């Protein structure tokens, strides 16, 4: 999935 990087950005 490509949510890993998305979550890091939101964090």
UniProtKB/Swiss-Prot annotation:
Indicate whether ATP-binding appears among the record's keywords.
Answer: no
Q: Does the keyword Secreted apply?
A: yes
An annotated GO cellular component: extracellular region
This protein's UniProt keywords: Protease inhibitor, Secreted, Serine protease inhibitor
Q: Which residues form a coiled coil?
A: none
Location in the cell reads: Secreted
Q: Name one GO biological process term.
A: regulation of proteolysis
Gene Ontology MF, one: serine-type endopeptidase inhibitor activity
What is the predominant subcellular site recorded for this chain?
Answer: secreted
Protein function = Serine protease inhibitor. The major targets of this inhibitor are plasmin and trypsin, but it also inactivates matriptase-3/TMPRSS7 and chymotrypsin.
Q: How does it assemble?
A: Forms protease inhibiting heterodimer with TMPRSS7.
Q: Which family does it belong to?
A: Belongs to the serpin family.
Task: Report what the protein is called.
Answer: Alpha-2-antiplasmin
- Organism the protein comes from: Struthio camelus
Gene that produces this protein: SERPINF2
């Amino acid at each position: 999935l490509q949510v890993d990087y998305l979550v890091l950005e939101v964090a």
